[in-house]
Amino acid sequence: MAGEGDQQDAAHNMGNHLPLLPADSEDEDDEIEMEVEDQDSKEARKPNIINFDTSLPTSHTYLGADMEEFHGRTLHDDDSCQVIPVLPEVLMILIPGQTLPLQLSHPQEVSMVRNLIQKDRTFAVLAYSNVQEREAQFGTTAEIYAYREEQEFGIEVVKVKAIGRQRFKVLELRTQSDGIQQAKVQILPECVLPSTMSAVQLESLNKCQVFPSKPISWEDQYSCKWWQKYQKRKFHCANLTSWPRWLYSLYDAETLMDRIKKQLREWDENLKDDSLPENPIDFSYRVAACLPIDDVLRIQLLKIGSAIQRLRCELDIMNKCTSLCCKQCQETEITTKNEIFSLSLCGPMAAYVNPHGYVHETLTVYKASNLNLIGRPSTVHSWFPGYAWTIAQCKICASHIGWKFTATKKDMSPQKFWGLTRSALLPTIPETEDEISPDKVILCL
């Protein structure tokens, strides 16, 4: 484990630095060498075929294959008050449905997890907008579904896979005599809004409505005609109101989901509808978990209690926030929305944990700029098996941005990509759009 002086390096490393390939330079005595990223990144192109097994990142094989798995789930009643223990070292905003991998070595945390396994396996993850914030107002319950204990250098370590379940509002926080923090929370309900046309159409005639059969593929002209015909029939009752059909479609869950799916297909050309949740609530959380937004925006999404409003906000963010800059510099562009792609079944971004217990939500992109590479490539504890990682820092302020991943075999595709940590990125609205300053643009929140 890293010493006190190496805490920052421990947060950025996936494992110890081990050379994957012999260094080109003869100066092999330097433990760490700085390399400025060359034109290789700028010339990177999107590969036509991805032969990487996208199920590997979601399985978190780096935690070990022999984890004890649990079945069933714990759900609390809406608006009920619960007292749930808090894991203090989990500094991320967990979204319901999002997977949270953990590696815990502190005796207090190990003891707490053991007790949770004997009960309902549920703990609280508090949502802080920044590390200086002392009290959180919202959070998400997390349920452990896989667990493993082992010893590393005589230290007991617990490896956990958990999943976000329900949003809550924090009512009270108190610390027990054993140091474990307990949170009294109120479970927040999901507001399910009726159909936009429900007020003007007779429910008795719903069974008489006939809709065209859904196309198998969305890539041909027939699909576009099908959707236009479907929209006309779905909103035909708008003719009886004072408002146009397009206005109702802005608050229709199915229409919003379809527009977001078109954006997601730009990140993953092989995306299939059956791999996405059909329920608007689950779908909205799935999208929220893979959006590269900062903590302030993410908490705003977590506060929203309606799937339709959440979908509207997500679509607005995807359309406007097209540039990702260094959070420390705020003006140094690292990548753009067009470079995002998916190398995992859960989308372009997911949470991973390094051997030191630091959780990073990592976004995969083809191309990144204004970055320096630190050290040599290493395959130790790689979140993407078959790829070696190298620490990447901002070229201007030297803050940690993520990692560059390079394939260890020539037949792998893509040969290289970047994994950028969400906490280091700042979503930005380019000034060229609509000639409006980003500070004056208001998102649909």
From Swiss-Prot:
Domain of life per record? Eukaryota
Region feature Disordered, mapped onto this chain:
1-48
**rRNA processing in keyword set:** no
| UniProt-annotated binding residues for (S)-thalidomide | H381, W383, W389
Question: Is this entry keyworded Signal?
Answer: no
Q: Could you tell me which residue ranges the CULT domain spans?
A: 321-429
Localization recorded for this chain is: Cytoplasm; Nucleus; Membrane
GO terms under cellular component? Cul4A-RING E3 ubiquitin ligase complex; cytoplasm; membrane; nucleus; perinuclear region of cytoplasm
Q: What does the entry's PTM section describe? A: Ubiquitinated, ubiquitination is mediated by its own DCX protein ligase complex.
Q: Which residues bind Zn(2+)?
A: C326, C329, C394, C397
Ranges where the Lon N-terminal domain occurs: 84-322
PANTHER family referenced in this protein's UniProt entry, alphabetically: CEREBLON, PROTEIN CEREBLON
Q: Protein name, please? A: Protein cereblon
Q: What is the lineage of its organism?
A: Eukaryota, Metazoa, Chordata, Craniata, Vertebrata
Instruction: State the gene name recorded for this protein.
Output: Crbn
